[in-house]
Curated annotation (Swiss-Prot):
Name of the featured protein: CMP-sialic acid transporter 3
Region (Disordered): 385-405
Gene from which the chain derives: UTR6
Species whose genome carries this gene: Arabidopsis thaliana
Family: Belongs to the nucleotide-sugar transporter family. CMP-Sialate:CMP antiporter (TC 2.A.7.12) subfamily.
Main location: Golgi
Length: 405
């Protein structure tokens, strides 16, 4: 076996080894057989993600009154999780009604209990997301919406490191250089002095901003990678059932946060609807739609694509914040965005793929060509074709994602 490709001793054809850990099939192998309809769907998902992610900082900014929030950010996160739970239940009911005869019922108690046990790892990203969602509001106290989006792009580098460690994904030198370009683009946008003064919580602005930035980058990066790992490790489980567990855990953690606020501030803070406005209602719907869309990225695509998709939303955020709130679009911002787009093009370029990935895809296509030629010969000799088919009964299912073991 070489580079994850095994050679059949009987016919010397190339086959993907089910034990290979170099490249995850969830990332690469499915892209070879992507249909035109799925490509269109992926484009629509990216466009929708850009709009939702780009609109979120604007809605958060609109929710502030005199630079402060009259509502509890935890209450917004809790209502968002409740909205996503309702969506998951509705979609699960619809999926159950369209099940074929003989399939294991999705709504049976045994199926639910078994799926809950298999997907208990989703509690980890749910907790991290609960922390991150609160940090999104805190970051708005330090930066304008466009800057928040630029800072969030720092997550890509942290995610890449975590993917290499957790998912065993390999990146080429060109892809690492693309990530470095991304950091340069973000830095160019930040080449201006921070305003002086103190924040509402009494911490010097520079210190508070740096601390929040480190947490704001690290926590959601870990949440995204662990979420992707948990979703892909139970690939055969319905995504709506997995989302039900993920959002259920999230609602529990946010409710515990509300109880903690009640203990700290008193019973008056238990009113989760206090201080909400029309802008916060749109914010809740936007956050819910964004979370639902993210789950499809994590299960059927990958986290890097999701984060680069969110990067494109920076343009929308910058233009919207300038039009609605009068924020100035600086030359640094335009230069930073240009560098970010160059980075994105370089990262996803076919020439930037890791050498092992190129060899695997080339060997896989060569193996498929040999198999096709051999199948044509077996049409003449049916007995030989039957023997050859029997020799490959052990090949793994292409639908099963290859995760580190």
């Amino acid at each position: 076996m070489k580079n994850g490709i095994a050679e059949c001793p009987a016919c010397h054809s190339k086959l993907v080894s089910p034990g290979s850990k170099t490249i995850s099939r969830a990332y690469d192998d499915h892209k070879i057989r992507v249909s035109s309809k799925q490509r269109v769907l992926n484009v629509l998902l990216v466009v929708g993600d850009c709009m939702l992610v780009g609109l979120q900082p604007v809605l958060v900014y609109m929710s502030k009154v005199d630079g402060k929030f009259n509502f509890s950010p935890i209450s917004v996160n809790f209502l968002t999780e409740i909205a996503k739970v309702i969506f998951a239940i509705v979609m699960l009911l619809i999926q159950a009604r369209h099940q074929k005869v003989g399939e294991k019922p999705l709504l049976s108690v045994s199926t639910f209990v078994q799926a809950a046990r298999n997907n208990v790892l989703l509690a980890v990203p749910a907790l991290l997301y609960a922390i991150n969602n609160y940090l999104k509001f805190t970051m708005q106290l330090y930066f304008n919406p466009a800057t928040v989006k630029m800072l969030s792009n720092l997550k890509v580098l942290v995610i890449a490191v975590l993917l290499k460690m957790v998912m065993k994904r390999r990146f080429s030198i060109i892809q690492w250089e693309a990530l470095a370009l991304l950091l340069i683009g973000i830095s160019v946008n930040q080449l201006r002095s921070l305003p002086e003064g103190a924040t509402a919580i009494g911490i010097p602005l520079a210190t508070g901003a740096y601390v929040c930035t480190v947490i704001f980058v690290t926590v959601p990066s870990m949440a995204s990678v662990f979420n992707e790992y948990a979703l892909k490790s139970q690939y055969d489980t319905s995504i709506y059932l997995q989302n039900l567990f993920l959002y259920g855990y999230g609602a529990i953690f946010n409710f515990l946060g509300i109880l903690g606020t009640v203990i700290y501030k008193g019973p008056g803070s238990f009113d989760i609807l206090q201080g909400h406005s029309r802008a916060t209602m749109f914010l809740i719907l936007n956050n819910a739609a964004q979370g639902i869309l993210s789950s499809f990225f994590f299960k059927y695509a990958d986290t890097i694509l999701k984060k680069y998709s969110s990067t494109v939303a920076t343009i929308f955020t910058g233009i919207a914040s300038a039009a609605l709130f009068g924020h100035v679009i600086t030359m640094n911002f335009l230069l930073g965005i240009s560098i970010v787009f160059i980075s994105m093009h370089q990262f996803f370029s076919p020439l930037a793929k890791a050498r092992d990935e190129q060899q695997q895809n080339g060997n896989l296509e060569l193996g498929n060509t040999k198999d096709t030629h051999r199948a044509n010969e077996s049409f003449i000799n049916m007995a030989a074709g039957a023997n050859e088919e029997a020799s490959h009964r052990g090949e793994s299912d292409d639908r099963t994602p290859l995760l580190p073991r």
